[in-house]
């Protein structure tokens, strides 16, 4: 059986300097031939291509890890934030500029990462979600966290004999509450990283875990469960009640004694999992183990990191939650495609039902059945969200201004609504802060940018400068555009 952790990796490096990497990677999965003619953009797609089945049950390994390592909650991570993002006037990074393709839509809100995260070549930000996805009242306890995902680029050029960047650390999350200022620093917002891991039992029968080598181009949070896009396979699922703490005494220089009498170490950057009776985490205090997965039922139709085909399973490039109908939540999933002459497909977007009682995907007879699917009107889509029937799409153009597009279902087809909205350079996943918990509350469309600021010619253009930020547009501002 092909399980998620056995599958070949697929990462989509889309920066001009990196190229459209892996564009011809041959994958060890069944591949369907590319049709001679492209599907018509906006037409209904075969919805069953998005159907999913549950993967292996990892709960026993997670339970065993929780008997060895203490758990913490999301609010604890926020309280233990050891990095500070800046907002308002203190956030000076500007990936919007004046815009290459017309008047840029300036964000209503913007947060800048700390200097290390803003400039790192190792970690690339991709996915975003938040408590407005997770909870109808838009609160986690008393907090309003955002969560973002970064993948480890694992660039061999960064790897030296004494460098901790040699191992591929997989995917990390950042937990940040944009509404809670740092005491004494009104423009500061604390945040904390946590490493995603896959649990397993080692050859001695002991519970351990390993890094998860995926792109994590989209994440979505519903109730306790965090969904992470696994490009060629489907979805990985994590439980926010299972965040493990490897340094509860907050003294990194001394190994902690674990609940089962062993040790945990947060100083060795090269190691992960249980090794010689010590638990490691590539120096991260917190790790979040995978609890479940969903795998595409259809054979994977894609054999390229960049291009797409019209049939077979899609790529899970990005995901989001549609909470328009409070009792019928939906997970939106779509593809990134860089069309060319031989591969003209623009990509597909589908909708999968969520069981509002459990927070997991809704199954019938062991299958998650897609409720709708369409071919995308345009390619180069990095993120998609849907609310009250309106689709929102982030599109990227290397180190040029990105664009925000809208679309609706009209006469049975997914068609453009209004004109292009010039956006930030390198826009990624999308998340809607729906504001349903308070009548008249401002609704926001959140996203983040992936390209770090550097001195290359394309990144210093005043029309489209590079830089990493979290940002939000008011939905009302977007809908007011022609």
Short names for language-model regions:
Residues 2-4, 17-118, 463-482:
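Sequence/structural signature of beta-propeller modules
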Residues 69-121, 180-210, 251-312, 361-377, ...:
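Surface-exposed loop and turn segments in beta-propeller and other repeat-based domains
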Residues 113-138, 148-217:
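Blade-loop segments of beta-propeller domains
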Residues 119-143, 211-222, 308-330, 377, ...:
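Structural signature of eukaryotic scaffold interfaces centered on beta-propeller domains
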Residues 134, 151-152, 232, 241, ...:
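Residue-level signature of beta-propeller blades and closely related beta-rich strand-turn architectures
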Residues 144, 320-323, 327-438:
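Loop/turn-rich, solvent-exposed surfaces of beta-rich toroidal or solenoidal domains
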Residues 155-177, 234-242, 330, 339-355, ...:
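Structural motif
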Residues 176-186, 239-277, 325, 339-365, ...:
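Short loop/turn segments immediately following beta-strands, especially the blade-tip
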């Amino acid at each position: 059986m092909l399980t998620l952790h056995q599958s070949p990796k697929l990462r989509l490096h889309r920066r001009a300097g990196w190229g459209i990497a892996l564009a011809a990677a041959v994958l060890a999965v069944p591949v369907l031939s590319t049709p001679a003619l492209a599907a018509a953009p906006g037409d209904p797609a075969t919805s069953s291509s998005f159907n999913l089945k549950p993967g292996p049950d990892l709960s026993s390994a997670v339970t065993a890890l929780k008997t060895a390592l203490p758990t913490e909650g999301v609010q604890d991570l926020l309280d233990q934030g050891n990095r500070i993002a800046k907002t308002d006037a203190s956030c000076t990074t500007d990936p919007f500029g004046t815009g290459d393709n017309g008047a840029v839509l300036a964000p209503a809100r913007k947060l800048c990462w700390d200097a290390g995260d803003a400039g790192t070549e190792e970690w690339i930000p991709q996915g975003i979600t938040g408590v407005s996805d997770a909870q109808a009242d838009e609160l986690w306890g008393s907090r309003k966290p955002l969560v973002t995902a970064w993948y480890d680029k694992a660039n061999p050029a960064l790897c030296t004999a004494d460098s901790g960047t040699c191992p591929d650390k997989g995917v990390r999350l950042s937990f940040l509450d944009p509404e809670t200022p740092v005491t004494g620093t009104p423009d500061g917002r604390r945040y904390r990283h946590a490493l995603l891991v896959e649990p397993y039992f080692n050859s001695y029968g002991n519970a351990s875990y390993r890094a998860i080598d995926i792109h994590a181009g989209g994440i979505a949070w519903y109730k306790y469960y965090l969904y992470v896009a696994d490009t060629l396979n489907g979805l990985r699922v994590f439980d926010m009640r299972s965040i493990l703490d490897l340094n509860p005494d907050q003294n990194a220089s001394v190994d902690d004694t674990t609940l089962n009498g062993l040790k945990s170490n947060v100083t060795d950057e090269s190691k992960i999992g249980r090794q010689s009776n010590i638990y490691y985490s590539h120096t991260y205090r917190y790790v979040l183990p995978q609890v479940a997965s969903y795998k595409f039922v259809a054979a994977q139709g894609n054999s390229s990191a960049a291009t797409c085909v019209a049939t077979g399973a899609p790529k899970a490039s990005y995901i989001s939650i549609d909470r328009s109908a409070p009792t019928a939540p939906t997970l939106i999933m779509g593809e990134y495609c860089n069309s060319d002459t031989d591969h003209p497909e623009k990509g597909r977007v589908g909708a999968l039902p969520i069981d509002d009682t459990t927070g997991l995907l809704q199954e019938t007879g062991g299958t998650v059945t897609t409720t709708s699917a369409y071919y995308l009107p345009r390619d180069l889509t990095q993120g998609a969200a849907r609310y009250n029937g309106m689709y929102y799409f982030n599109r990227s153009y290397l180190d040029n201004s990105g664009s925000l597009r809208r679309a609706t279902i009209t006469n049975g087809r997914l068609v453009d609504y209004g004109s292009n909205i010039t956006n930030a350079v390198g826009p990624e996943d999308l998340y809607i802060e729906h504001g349903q918990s308070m009548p008249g509350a401002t609704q926001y469309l959140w996203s983040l940018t992936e390209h770090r600021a550097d001195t290359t010619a394309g990144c210093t253009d005043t029309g489209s400068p590079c830089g990493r930020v979290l940002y939000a547009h008011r939905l009302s501002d977007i809908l007011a555009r022609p």
